[in-house]
Regions:
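Hydrophobic alpha-helical segments of integral membrane proteins
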Residues: 26-30, 37, 41, 64, ...
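Short, glycine-rich, amphipathic interfacial segments at transmembrane boundaries or analogous
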Residues: 101-151, 209-228
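A hydrophobic, helix-centered structural microdomain
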Residues: 58-129, 172, 237-238, 243-259
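Low-complexity, charge- and small-residue-enriched intrinsically disordered regions
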Residues: 37-56, 248-259
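Membrane-embedded multi-pass helical conduit in multi-pass membrane proteins
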Residues: 1-50
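C-terminal terminal-structure detector
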Residues: 61, 147, 197-259
Length: 259
């Protein structure tokens, strides 16, 4: 009735201007009122059935502080690691044919894909060989491990053991695709296998290091890793990032759990 009443002034003006138009105006107003009323009703039902929106994982201040730490840490690390990066690039070229860098699509915050950069640690056609080494269609979980992967080069094995292959990811951190600390960035085809709970780990930027890396690295099961990462997200604090960064140093130097 309210929608119908709101159209009465228009109907009166139409009648005064043209009686012929005025005769059909009530039917037009009735149709208008019905459409508006139906739309309002559906909208109210959808509103009432909506679950409360989740609060952002990180508050604005936390996001700002984390981003400032990422920018400062990545920039200083890139400068400090420049001589080592040049030596690694030379070693890769001398060890095997192919490019120095390996670029692959990974899934970032909120499911957005980005191009992750690493030093190449495998033979050039490693992606094509993967299907010959593991039946991807039969995976019970969205994760796989290949100990003693034959695709890894000699230099690549050394780089992986001490996570030196991940140094170029500092560029991803500067670009805003990654963070210094966060969940592990996963491949797109693995994320397609995620259920709703597993997708919760995409609520923040993936990290160069994270709770997985300082609590067992590749020796963890996917369930253990997921639990650690979700706990990190749900109880985020900047000091936890600092603690993880400090713990990463001895973990990397020991070289355990990296495949």
């Amino acid at each position: 009735l309210a929608f119908l009443a709101s159209g009465l002034p228009f109907g009166w003006k139409a009648w005064r201007k043209d009686h012929a138009v005025g005769l059909v105006t009530p039917f037009m107003l009735a149709a208008r009122a019905l459409a508006l009323g139906a739309g309002y009703g559906v909208g109210m039902l959808r509103f009432l059935n909506l679950e409360p929106q989740e609060r952002p994982v990180l508050k604005a201040r936390q996001r700002l502080m984390k981003r400032l730490m990422d920018l400062a840490g990545a920039l200083l690390s890139l400068i400090a690691a420049a001589p080592l990066s040049l030596a690694i690039a030379l070693a890769i070229k001398l060890d095997s044919s192919g490019p120095v860098l390996y670029v692959q699509d990974r899934v970032g915050v909120n499911g957005r894909t980005f191009r992750m950069i690493k030093f190449r640690t495998m033979v050039p056609d490693a992606d094509k060989q993967l299907g010959e080494l593991i039946d991807l269609a039969s995976l019970e979980e969205p994760v796989f491990k290949l100990k003693g992967d034959p695709r890894v080069t000699r230099v690549g094995g050394f780089l992986r053991r001490f996570s030196l292959d991940e140094l170029p990811q500092l560029i991803n951190v500067l670009a805003g695709d990654m963070s210094l600390v966060g969940p592990r960035p996963e491949e797109t085809w693995l994320v397609r296998l995620y259920n709703d709970q597993q997708r919760r780990r995409l609520a923040v930027r993936p990290g160069m290091t994270g709770p997985m890396q300082v609590n067992g690295r590749g020796d963890l099961t996917f369930a253990q890793r997921l639990q650690l990462e979700l706990d990190y997200i749900e109880h985020y604090a900047l000091r936890r990032d600092l603690v993880i960064l400090l713990k990463t140093i001895p973990v990397v130097l020991r070289g355990r759990g990296a495949y």
